[in-house]
Amino acid sequence: MISVRIGGAAVRIHFSFFVFNALIFLMRSSSLILSFYGVCLLHESGHLAALKLTGGRISSVDISGAGAVINTRKGGIATAKNRLIVLLAGPAANIFAYLMLSLFGCHGKFPQLSLIAAVYNMLPYHSLDGGAIVSLFSVGTAYERAVNSILTAFKMLVIAVSAAAAYFVGREAFPLFAASLALFTGDIARRR
């Protein structure tokens, strides 16, 4: 892990980020890679802008193969409403970019990846925005256990479907399988 401080916030880049990048560079074209990183930067900028607007402050940023996690300082975005705004801001930035670029006739890789990133980040995995939103409303409630059971079944279905896609479609669909397996494994590790 590489760790630096930027503006008082700890920024940690985990080994899995470098492994993920190596796989991307092996399997994809350079224009797709640049679009991918642009979409990721746009997504995280949406979160950061909302965090700033709601009075939150960053304590650390963890960058791994599963994505980026922005941790806030205590006393920042304390209300559930503000946390929800910050969590939705990343996917909203991606959807806004997709709509604006499509409106002006740009139908290339960047708008497509932007829409995919918005949908992907709303999946109910703990390391993604969708999972954080589910946790925001279910942790500590009487429904927490039932919600976790339903989500586990959903995640296993996603793994099965992505494995079938990788088998029938081939190499192009393999990243879907790898991502669904990595996200599920991350959720299991997080529970321990």
Range-by-range predicted roles:
Residues 1-192:
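Hydrophobic transmembrane alpha-helices and their immediate loop junctions
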